């Protein structure tokens, strides 16, 4: 796991003692995006989940850990997108993923990106990079943020 061990333990404890307890982001002061109008709209949307059960959050973090541990088994070219301002996915977790990947991969960390890369104010830059990579994964990305492919075989 790339998660803080104390937080991991507290989440495990909560999931196993008060699994139906609902948690919100209230008081966390986490900024998931620089697109404030979009965040406000999500906050008003009645279909957006505004609290999650403790066991659900624990399950999500376990799934993320399993995905990270499975990274060496990924056998397809991969575009890995990261955000320099991501306050939800720790930089260490992103770097661990890149170290574990054994397949050919392109890694991009957007200096002005946030957790919600595809909804951030610079989303169009990310969209163009994704479309370009889908069309030709060996071509430079339009943003210029891409690095040379890693582990090319």
Where are these regions (language model features)?
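Residues at alpha-helix caps and immediate loop-helix transition turns in enzyme cores, especially N-
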Residues: 2-6, 90-93, 122-123
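Short beta-strand/loop motif that positions the catalytic acidic residue
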Residues: 74, 80-82, 86
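Catalytic active-site module of serine/aspartate enzymes centered on a nucleophile-bearing elbow/loop
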Residues: 104-153
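Short alpha-helix in the alpha/beta-hydrolase fold that links the catalytic acid
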Residues: 76, 90-100
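Active-site nucleophile elbow and catalytic-triad environment of alpha/beta-hydrolase enzymes
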Residues: 52-70
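Alpha/beta-hydrolase-fold enzymes
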Residues: 1-53
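Acidic catalytic loop of the alpha/beta-hydrolase fold
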Residues: 49-50, 85-89, 116
């Amino acid at each position: 796991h790339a998660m803080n061990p104390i937080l991991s333990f507290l989440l495990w404890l909560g999931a196993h003692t008060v699994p139906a307890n609902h948690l919100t982001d209230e008081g966390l002061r986490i900024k998931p995006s620089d697109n404030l109008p979009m965040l406000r709209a999500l906050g008003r949307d009645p279909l957006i989940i505004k609290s999650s059960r403790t066991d659900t959050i624990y399950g999500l973090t376990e799934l993320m850990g399993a995905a990270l541990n499975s990274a060496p088994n990924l056998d397809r070219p991969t575009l890995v997108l990261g955000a320099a301002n991501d306050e939800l996915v720790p930089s260490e977790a992103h770097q661990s993923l890149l170290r574990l990947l054994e397949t050919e991969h392109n890694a991009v960390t957007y200096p002005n990106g946030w957790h919600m890369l595809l909804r951030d104010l610079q989303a169009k830059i990310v969209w163009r990079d994704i479309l370009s990579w889908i069309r030709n994964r060996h071509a430079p990305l339009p943003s210029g943020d891409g690095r040379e492919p890693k582990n090319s075989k």
